């Protein structure tokens, strides 16, 4: 309560109340959300991919194509379940969600170019260092094998970027960021992403199966999930999930067109992406966002 004092003329003067500062909002605990998301993402993906493995793989049995493709949508299914659950409960959007706005479209396009450039630069440098030569014939064959440019681009967009990014970046990332720093979240999601991909090494007909898990190329693929997670996270922080989808699409598409399989090329790309994300993360600061 305010206190009263007297002036020299005896007139009471009310002293101002002490200033108060608003307490910071409580840090929400998203462990239940994250557990539910991870269980759904892994269960949907691994059950589908397990079925593809049991059917003999996509190389020898066309029936394996459906579960193989459906497996990629585990993270998206998890994201949709959490979104519906949050709305039904009337819960607020997590503080670290980055909403996409039309004004950010140019930034997303620039990040798409950057993502592709990290792969192209790595392949060119590896070629100069004695690695495999780049060939347009490989790219032409990759596009032709799936029925032309339109089918190729749609397939590359859906099977990976669209099926994964709303989950890993749009759902898991903001909730992990509530208690962890950006770099810590990148490491957590990078390792999680690498583990999530492991069944693909056992599906005949996949890129991962061709690489082989117990080979330098397979090991480098697994390790590359960490700088890749950092790269798409840096894109997400700047322009939302549309940007992370764009970067994921650009990297995957460029790697397929260039047939990146040699360890020397993979290592060079991994190094360039690591340097790129270091620069991106160091030059970007994020506060707590509220919708």
Residue ranges and their predicted role:
Residues 167, 171-174, 202-213:
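Membrane-interface interhelical connector segments
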Residues 120-128, 164-165, 182-204:
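Transmembrane alpha-helix/helix-exit interface in multi-pass inner-membrane proteins
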Residues 2-3, 18-161, 189, 256-291:
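Specific transmembrane helices
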Residues 210-272:
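Functionally important transmembrane alpha-helices
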Residues 163-190, 236-240:
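Membrane-interface helix/loop boundary segments of multi-pass membrane proteins
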Residues 121, 172, 228-232:
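Hydrophobic/aromatic residues in alpha-helical transmembrane segments
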Residues 34-38, 108, 171, 185-186, ...:
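Alpha-helical transmembrane segments and their helix-entry boundary regions
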